[in-house]
Amino acid sequence: MSQWFQLGLQNGNSPLMEQLIFFHDHALLVVILITSLVGFFLAALFSNKFLHRYLLDGQAIETVWTVIPAIILVAIALPSIRLLYLIDEIHNPALTIKVTGHQWYWSYEYSDLNDIQFDSYMIPSNELSTGMYRLLDVDNRSQCPMIKAIRLMITSDAVLHSWAVPSLGIKMDADPGRLNQSSLLVNMPGVFYGQCSEICGSGHSFMPIVIEAVGESDFLKWLELQIS
């Protein structure tokens, strides 16, 4: 989860988020280099006393400032396209979780496993225990096994929502009457927090998301408790 005065991205806890962080750093480096180069040329332009009033054209320099930006754009576009395909790629998922946005809470359905369903509401501030996070903790956490490919089916029964967990690299719109699909694979055990990322009404700020990634044996025990 994010920390106070944090300026960077959250630590990546899924292969997808790790790739997104790498691409962010790659693109940011290119932007910094371009900004520095343009700033240098602007400073040089305003500080020198030479005039070029009689320079009508320059084929060489025009070729350079056309070809080099094209190469830079391709260097940014290729990893971006690769990431877009990785986000959509879901191959033989071990589990499918259906997420439905309501006004204003989330419900989860494990239809592969005896049709387990439950609602997840934010815990009010006056009911929080020590160690809980205000506006982030819920009464029912969604559990999933770590290091397993999971398919998420996300929709809404009312207004537009967006199911987002930044540290897992997931942000998917929940649209009424439509199923959107995303993939999830968690690297390590832990509790990961997110929130609705689409302004959806008066309860928008009170729709937290909590994903708890556990080992396979612990996940099976949790399933037994849900079934019983």
From Swiss-Prot:
One of its GO terms (biological process) is ATP synthesis coupled electron transport. Cu cation A2 binds at residues 196, 198, 200, 204. Keywords: Copper, Electron transport, Magnesium, Membrane, Metal-binding, Mitochondrion, Mitochondrion inner membrane, Respiratory chain, Translocase, Transmembrane, Transmembrane helix, Transport. Its EC number is 7.1.1.9. Cu cation A1 binds at residues 161, 196, 200, 207. Pfam families: COX2, COX2_TM. GO terms for molecular function: copper ion binding; cytochrome-c oxidase activity. Gene3D superfamilies: 1.10.287.90, Cupredoxins - blue copper proteins. Residues 1-26, 83-228 are mitochondrial intermembrane. It is a multi-pass membrane protein. Belongs to the cytochrome c oxidase subunit 2 family. This is Cytochrome c oxidase subunit 2. It comes from Artemia franciscana (Brine shrimp). The gene is COII.
